[in-house]
Amino acid sequence: MDPKGTTVLDFIEEQAECSQSDSEQGSEENCSDISDLIDNAEYEQGNSAELFAQQQAFDFHKDICTTKRNLKRSLRNAFQCITSQSNTPASRSAPKRRLLDDSGYNEDISTEVVQVDENGGSEGYGSLTSQHLSGVCLNQGDNGGVDKENVDCTALLRAGSRRAAYLGVFKEKFTISFTALTRIFKNDKTCCRNWVGTVYRAREELLEASKTILQKCCDFILLLTHTCKYGFLALFLLEFKTAKSRETVQRLFEHILQVEKEDMLLEPPKLKSLPAATFWWKIQHSNNSFKWGTLPDWIARQTMISHQIADDEPFSLSVMVQWAYDHNYTEESTIAYHYAKLASEDSNAAAFLKCNNQVKHVKECAQMTRYYKTAEMTEMSMGQWIKKCIGEIEGVGDWKQICKFLKFQNVNFLSFMSALKDLLHRVPKRNCMVICGPPNTGKSMFVMSFMKALQGKVLSFVNSKSHFWLQPLRGAKVAVLDDATRATWTYFDTYLRNGLDGTPVSLDMKHRAPLQICFPPLVITTNVNVMQDPAYFYLHSRIVCFEFPNTFPLDEAGNPLLLIDELSWKSFFERLWTQLDLTDAEEDEDGEPRSPFRCCPRSVATSL
């Protein structure tokens, strides 16, 4: 202030100046009805760190309880997982242990592990399982008791220790481990024909009875008995008639031997292990063993010298061709399928399956078989061919059905026999027989049964646009063309007059030069009466025609009253063999003049 003093006006101006915040604060204080809304009192600093620690401990305890509940539900699965780790190689067990360690459960109970007595189980197989189970399963409760979870773990631990003890006894008695003779099936429902079973605590009289009872369902039984600290120890090698699962075999042993499933060790044998096969072959000659049935192939193949020599035998194509020829197989798919099925019986078929070029062998086998069959058929006379064909037809027929049918169609039987004789002997100008008539008169049934009996070939005019549609005539003794239309007869009248005569013609072959052949006996069915059509005048002298005017007779159910099939033609040729003049001059009265065809060298046994 001015030392000289302050005037009244200056004082009023100075006191009248105020800030906006002061006015707003005053208005708010005037408008509020709540007293002491804001506590501006000072407080002392409390123990906030202890409160935070309590909250963290509560959350941690809650998470631990949740984890324990989840582990309690899947306790048995955890035990199976740990057991599988102990049975698998070390390279696979490490990742599974990491999965269990990641759960956090192991760290939580690390201070509550109960030490398992090392003398309670055997070394090797059972020790790892016991250590895992002691760390995971044996957890004491807060009140000092053992809950249901721990009771289950103890039972599982005892079962694992029992299995380990049984494995130790097995190795002590047989000087070889059980796992060296068997392979592991993890699933009890996996089926197999061969099973290895070790049974403990069985009664002697039941073991003797099992030798007879098991013969009903087995092809091979090998039983070896020993005595051990658990009583009788029985080792079974069984080959069942049908594949069975572990559960089925367990129930079978429980029923026959009256033992618990915990007292059994069941696994399939190692089929490709030479030491295992040698073990089984050796114990079958021991004094306290029982054997019934034929030795399984997987043992004989690895232990017997003859089987080993057969396994080393190389593949021979000629043997395969001889097999296909004897069974009349000419198609690639049929040869490949049926020859592969012989691999378990024939050494050459087994060698065929080992080849990397099976397709090449199958094609060559089929081609060679067709070559041999065609050459054999060409060399045969018509009488020899008919005898061969009807000899392959099994059964007895009635030749009179053919005679009745010809009589029903008003066909002279002697005229038909004369025409059939000329047809089979391929007389010129009489090399083609035509059966004409309206539909549903039995033409196709009559001709097709004749073709099947003589193993003839079928021509289809639908392929006439191809140059090779007549190629089946190259390998046929008899040919049939069913339901020829006017277009077919026009084609014959234009291009195939010489073929109907029976004289040589040039036949176009696929992938080959044109071949000169004579048409085989040809039988044609048609609805066109060629003999009465002047448009085909030049064919009249080249065909022999029979007309079937009557509809084929049927009964009320629609079944034919006259049945003509391959058996009817077989009986027909046997009955009228002499009338058809089918006997060859060089054929002896003793029977077959030809020796069987062989395309591979005879074996020693066959030659002797």
From Swiss-Prot:
Gene3D superfamilies per the record? 3.40.1310.10, P-loop containing nucleotide triphosphate hydrolases, Zinc finger, large T-antigen D1 domain
Cited InterPro entries: Helicase_SF3_DNA-vir, P-loop_NTPase, PPV_DNA_helicase_E1_C, PPV_DNA_helicase_E1_N, PPV_E1_DBD, PPV_E1_DBD_sf, Rep_E1_papillomaV, Znf_lg_T-Ag_D1_dom_sf
Question: Between which residues do disulfide bridges form?
Answer: none
Residues binding ATP: G437, P438, P439, N440, T441, G442, K443, S444
- Provide the primary localization: host cell
Q: What does this protein do?
A: ATP-dependent DNA 3'-5' helicase required for initiation of viral DNA replication. It forms a complex with the viral E2 protein. The E1-E2 complex binds to the replication origin which contains binding sites for both proteins. During the initial step, a dimer of E1 interacts with a dimer of protein E2 leading to a complex that binds the viral origin of replication with high specificity. Then, a second dimer of E1 displaces the E2 dimer in an ATP-dependent manner to form the E1 tetramer.
Oligomeric and partner information:
Can form hexamers. Interacts with E2 protein; this interaction increases E1 DNA binding specificity. Interacts with host DNA polymerase subunit POLA2. Interacts with host single stranded DNA-binding protein RPA1. Interacts with host TOP1; this interaction stimulates the enzymatic activity of TOP1.
Enumerate the HAMAP family for this protein.
PPV_E1 (MF_04000)
Q: What's this protein's name?
A: Replication protein E1
Q: Which organism is it from?
A: Bos taurus papillomavirus 4 (Bovine papillomavirus 4)
